[in-house]
Amino acid sequence: MQLTTTPGIDGKRITRYCGVVAGEAVLGANIFKDLFAGIRDLVGGRSGTYEKELQRARDIALEELQQRAHDLGANAVVGIDIDYEVLGKENGMLMVSASGTAVIVE
């Protein structure tokens, strides 16, 4: 299945719009990971821990989006938008949502 942030796919023609699809992932932050990330930020390094969690959440959201598109009979999703939110008490949760339009392309 093709996934793209653009409204179409070069060289392909959209023959049917199947509907809007979305996928979400909400992950809790571990206090030890947060502490380590804070120390890394203080010394100017990148937080690999947070980057891995963001990647994992994004992958889950896109997998859900793809499955929902497949369930509608689509073979592509166009116009994908990915949003990130920090939620919960003391910002202890990370939510990634992905949405787009499921289509059939030829």
Swiss-Prot record:
Signal peptide: none annotated. Pfam families: YbjQ_1. This is UPF0145 protein Nmul_A0734. It comes from the Bacteria. Belongs to the UPF0145 family. InterPro entries: UPF0145_dom_sf (IPR035439), UPF0145_YbjQ-like (IPR002765). The lineage of its organism: Bacteria, Pseudomonadati, Pseudomonadota, Betaproteobacteria, Nitrosomonadales.
